[in-house]
């Protein structure tokens, strides 16, 4: 078929580098009503999240299984990022990626907010749901907050605590209240025993 005379309308927004982080999320929020976009997606270009992503790609961790091969924790700044990276390259390259970034060590923006707010004593925010909790987490971040290596280590240690708590609670069969029991339990542990907890040790061992 001859499509020479077909005209396709397009709206193109040219954004300068200096304002990209500010404008791109707003464009996504206000112009796209046809695709389901989650609130957390609007923060994808946040400098804070970009820094967490950078750290997750450069920091090696001990293999909790005792193997000599070290691993990394994959922070998924954009949805589907892990699957996209895993599918790249040859089969051997894909296998190497999975060895380096095991699926169990993948976490998203909303996961990060859940672990941090549980530890900080805001389980009631976590209980409101992933998107609402993420909004509150980002709102409470100090302006220009950027994690360093030690902050990333501490966060992974908090993840390890949360995930272990989740497994224990799951075995107790709390049914539909599991999510609430887990976040409130982690908040209680942090509140009562924070001074005695050595996050660096958990990070070094990659387990409690």
Residue ranges, per PLM feature:
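Accessory terminal alpha-helical modules
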Residues: 2-208
